[in-house]
Amino acid sequence: MQHPVSTPALFAKKCKYACLTLIALSFVFLAAGCAGSAKPAYNIERYLLSWPSPPGDEARRLPVCIKFNRFSIAAAYNSTDMIFRDDDYGFDSFNYSRWAVNPADMIADGIAADMRSVGKYQAVFSRQETAGGRFVISGGIEEFYLRTDKSGKTALISMSVSVEDSVEKGTARILFQKKYLQEERLQETSPRGYARAASRATQKIAH
């Protein structure tokens, strides 16, 4: 019996099929390797400043409107990172915990909410509202971080606040200007404990 002899065309076809099979298998193994080496996803916990509103006092309401400018913040703290420092040079943040909002906006919103709650003014407008007011409140956050040292862990806030009369001109516009430095010890050593301590510190400045 005569055995069939492979032609060059048939041989080339078999080689092509074998190459395609190897390429397909390579992609499968590569995909499996990438999937196996992928880093696991972590949930990011987000925190807000929060404190009890002061009691109302509408009996002494003043016929004036207050407008909040957007508070500024030092570049080092201008993010949602929950920053901690152990000296004048160190600078770090929690890996899986963040502020839900930029600290400058959280502080301004909290102070504005307190002023509305008191009911002492005809109206209090936030930075997002288009309405204006005669008296304009501006602020600047200079430091906002968790200090960690031998004495323990402390929430630290350093900021300045000013109030201007938009009707006046020159130096007469500035009615009030003050710098605040508030520190509050943590009662719980955790990002949540830091958020609570920072809230108490901000509350003392606001009130």
What are these regions (language model features)?
Residues 21-31:
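Bacterial N-terminal signal peptides
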Residues 91-98, 168-204:
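Short secondary-structure boundary motifs at beta->alpha junctions and helix caps
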